[in-house]
Amino acid sequence: MTTDEEQHTKTHVDIVIVGGGPVGLLAANLAVKYGLSVRIVDIEFEPQHWGRGDWIHGRTLELLDHSGLATDLLATGARVETFSHHHQQVSSSVAYAPEHVVTKYKHLLCVGQHITESSLQHSLSEHDVQVERPWTVSQFQKDGRDSKYPLSVTLKNMLDASTCDIRAKYLLGCDGAHSDIRKQLDIAYEGESSKKNHGVLDALVHTSFHDRKSISFIKGPFGTHACMFPRENNLVRVMVQLSDEGDRNQIHLETVQHEARRALLPHRVEFTAVMWWTIYAVGQHVATHYTSSQEDPRIFLCGDACHSQSPTLGQGLNTGFGDVFNLVWKIAMVESGHAKASLLNTYEMERHPVAQQVIAMDKQIVQAVESKEQENLETLLRQYQLFISGFGISYRNNENNVMIQTGDRAPDFKVVHYATGSKVRLYDIWRKQVEETNMRWGFHLLVLAHDITQSMDAVIKGFKDFTVPLWMRVHIITTTVQKGVIEKQLSQQDDIDPAWIYMDKINQAQCHHGLIPEYNNNSNGNNDPVAIVVRPDLHIGWIGDFSKLSLGFIA
């Protein structure tokens, strides 16, 4: 029996995923990495070969890298580090990521969605999972017949109309802005669409326009505006506003090319080969709910199925990926028995506000791009710099202007490993440990121990009071940098593994300074250890005195 035949015979699976685009493929990849069984279906006869979302932001790259899914994309895409704005003879630029963000990825990656999908499908194939085409979910219900697999799901083949019934624990609707899963759940998709038509094309271009390495927003001499940026294999994507608000099906490629040339005047532009083009109208929508039930959530919406916006800042793909990174580890943790089902309610609680922020920002950016005032766009790009790149996305419960708090992205600081003396990033430590363990969704516990000669007793007591679960990895970070001093402290106890110890000796103890707002070279004499719990999606799950840590941070 072939792999495809074996897949089609699976009548009981953990997750059914509807939609074989990048969001659905990422969900399937994470699920199988976490030990969950999946079937993924797509209504289309074949995958997309060109077009659609092509920006992968810095924060998304961090998460893909952490999951072992970034290598092929990084080798292929075009790296962009600046936004630029051009109007007649005046040009200006804004850095993609703020200088203070500590990360390997201070750039976005411009790469075709078909390449992203191909990379994710290749990784998924290593787990003997393929997208089943052209299949869809024609109906589903929680019927109470099987407590372990509570969902009855009917799959329908769009080629011959044949059907098959399977049982599942969860259903993920990753089926786009026109989501049939969302419609079957009768969840409203609130928002508005513009009547203004825009053209977009991917092409090989010869041009005298000088800025070929940035995301370039261009205001032409006749009021036409365009956006142009590099892609993989010397391709260029051009997006341009069209003057025609009529039937977009009547707009031809020549019109898009003509308006792009007008926007770029007086520069010469020649489209030598157009690989893909389309016409779109800006729509900004958010689903009122992301799940069917708060009592026992089993059906979830992800990606464009629960939010859509303009392609101006490439937020769609990245927001969808953020949904999946937030959700799948929670499902895995619940299914492993380490968390209550109520943890799944936090998916909508955390991700719905993010989509609302994306829409609010998108409306302002679109208006600024179409405005005659150059300063408006520059101001907004600087204002939303952290959010656009994804580094500023947070699940905070409040708006207090505290340096670091629960819900924020965990910083990727550099430390020195005590045992090996090697300099290493926190994210690289965590990725390596994820690769070496079967507990792929594991948490990480950072204990900031200050001067370990003063705090060792408190650190040991903390570990006696808090039993570290198997799904949590420990890292003790100390400002003590003399290996001999640390060795002496470790020799006097048996509770702490030397492999846990890292020295905060880079940039004057950047971990302590960056993660403990009140830290200032211990001038206040406080050496109480601070605990920081980092979730599988690399957000901070809890921060506070180590002596107060418990597993209560899990919903």
What does each of the following model-derived ranges do?
Residues 2-14, 18, 33-34, 87-90, ...:
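Helical substrate-recognition/capping region of FAD-dependent monooxygenase/halogenase enzymes
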Residues 2-395:
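Core Rossmann-like FAD-binding/catalytic domain of the broad FAD-dependent monooxygenase superfamily
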